[in-house]
Amino acid sequence: MTISEVAQGFTSADADDDRWVDPRLIRAAAGAAARGTVLLTNDGVLPLAPQTRVAVFGRVQIDWFAVGYGSGGDVNAPYTTNLLDSLVEAGVAVDAELARTYRDWCAAQAVPTPQWGDWPRFHPEMELDDETVDAAATRAEIAVVVIGRAAGEDRENVLEPGSYYLTETERRLLEQ
């Protein structure tokens, strides 16, 4: 199956009523994502050893940017996943207490469904106190910080915090 075939023939035109996705589409999309992923540096951390204890920080671990923006990107995806659920599904020993903190906060601070052309470039980050970060650090061997951005037609990146630059909350999280 080629990407062209995927784009033209294996999705439903009526996505609100028909959520079926051809399994070949799922495999092709996963393969394209793997080929499009670039790891800049590794320093021996990846792949994670089985049962490595991982603290995952950042709301985008849950509130994932699953699609792009604009005419070709603002779609009703038949399903989505997020990094936290995918790590757990893969058997990574994520810090359950920190994950629960993020799940609860994200549920209380739900990302609104935007109108066309009014998409967010980022999702506001949760402020964490030093005690929460320190406690997670004592339970985990590795920390993963997830920061997300989105852009597309009618919502290009700009040279400001929350787009190309980190917000102050993101910067503080990285410094903790």
PLM regions and their residue ranges:
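C-terminal non-catalytic regions of proteins with extracellular/luminal or membrane-system context
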Residues: 1-176
